[in-house]
């Protein structure tokens, strides 16, 4: 997969290329219509889905499709809403959503990958704490947080919901 740039040199289209074929045969799988938005494509942590992310400076929208499909039809995860940012990842049958919707300093939602309209709060927003990005390893979700300018790492067992904090520093950054 690759993105093509528009006349303003911004990525606005996603194409699929099959090795050994001409680029003239490449298939357009996504085209961003809003000139203020750009797009890109990535693979989820469990490599089960491709995510097409489109965004401007304050708003995002994601589409997904299974990584093992030949019939590519990107599915809208959640319609864009002005000033709402979100990103999705998948791990062990769930989509995890890092978003600022109704959460100035972000929160993490999740839903089963086959039930995207059934989002539940997994990590709530926290007063005066920025809930940062997340990564996955085996049965664990690793995320960063920052409170009073002091960063910390949290490791959560996604089966038991037990969580452990790893202190990085007691000094503000």
Predicted features along the sequence, with ranges:
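Peripheral, non-catalytic segments that deliver or gate enzyme domains
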Residues: 1-173
